[in-house]
Amino acid sequence: FNKLIDEYNNNTIKNNYMDDIIEASKEYIKNHFSEDINVNNIASLFAVSPTYFSRLFKKEVGVPPVVFINKYRMERACSYFDETDFTVKEVAELCGYSDPFYFSKAFKSIVGVPPKEYRLRNSCKNSI
């Protein structure tokens, strides 16, 4: 019986630690999305392998970390387009992209429309 309790406690501690890693990594991504971050950087913060981190992240969050990073960056990009007059190049840089062309391709892939079209559609909504 004591062995079962010990095993339960060890599993609980392990699960809590894994939950902590995931929550801390999501917070890290949100605080550092404008920087050059990747799975290797994040995994090293928690002293785990990139493969293990990616598998754990996908299991807990539902998407791989790179998808989470890119989607979060695009959420922020949409906010910048909605709330500022920054150029596509400026928004790209603020969201961690050094190449505005690559940013535009990623934006269209995730959001569904190119950045300039997104801004036009939303400026119409905001002016009505």
Predicted regions and their residues:
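The cytosolic transmitter module of two-component sensor histidine kinases
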Residues: 18-22, 88
